């Protein structure tokens, strides 16, 4: 009998190590696709978010649909440097203008500026994380709150040491 491999059922834990940018982009899309309430993103700059395809129409549509589903749904982004966000991520900025009460974009300060592990977290149960900003390897875990918890805590530590940097009303200043 010929054995076929199919994707695991949606509730089964998924863990993968990625070596390439293309694999990482696919994994990020998977994490974003799992979001039902909140997305947390930490990265160094708008340019790196753009390189990870956060400016693409499909990604923005996914985030828009999440935010439209409920006013309590959130997108929180922490960046080391927010310069260039308008030119690098115009669709994200348009989304921020439309959903200013649901999206926050912060800039890291203090010890948080030393963080070097970009991550995307959805709903406390799914995450993509780059092991170090300068290295190609990254990991994705889906459907596992226990494995995601340390990265939620890590994000919250970074968030606590950040300040509001971009709002729908201070663009273009």
Please provide the spans of the model-predicted regions:
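HKD (HxKxxxxD) catalytic microenvironment of the phospholipase D
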Residues: 104-148
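Long, hydrophobic, amphipathic alpha-helical segments used as structural scaffolds
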Residues: 43, 71-79, 107, 159, ...
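Domain-start "cap" segments at the beginnings of catalytic or binding domains
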Residues: 1-35
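Primarily the HKD phosphodiesterase
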Residues: 31, 35-98
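Terminal leader/tail segments of proteins
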Residues: 25, 62, 66, 74-75, ...
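Signature of lipid phosphatidyltransferase scaffolds
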Residues: 2-7, 14, 18, 131-173
């Amino acid at each position: 009998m010929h054995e076929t491999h199919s994707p695991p059922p949606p509730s089964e834990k998924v863990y993968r190590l990625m070596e390439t940018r293309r694999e990482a982009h696919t994994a990020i899309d998977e994490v974003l696709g799992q979001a039902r309430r909140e997305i947390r993103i930490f990265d160094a700059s708008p340019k790196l978010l753009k390189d990870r395809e956060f400016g693409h129409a499909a990604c923005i549509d996914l985030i828009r649909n999440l935010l439209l589903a409920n006013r309590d749904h959130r997108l929180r982004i922490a960046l080391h440097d927010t310069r260039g966000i308008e030119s690098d991520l115009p669709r994200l900025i348009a989304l921020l203008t439309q959903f200013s009460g649901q999206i926050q974009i912060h800039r890291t300060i203090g010890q948080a500026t030393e963080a070097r592990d970009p991550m995307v977290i959805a709903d406390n149960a799914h995450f993509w994380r780059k092991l170090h900003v300068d290295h190609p390897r990254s990991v994705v875990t889906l459907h596992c709150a226990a494995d995601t918890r340390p990265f939620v805590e890590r994000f919250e530590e970074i968030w606590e040491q950040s300040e509001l940097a971009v709002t729908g009303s201070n663009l273009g200043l």
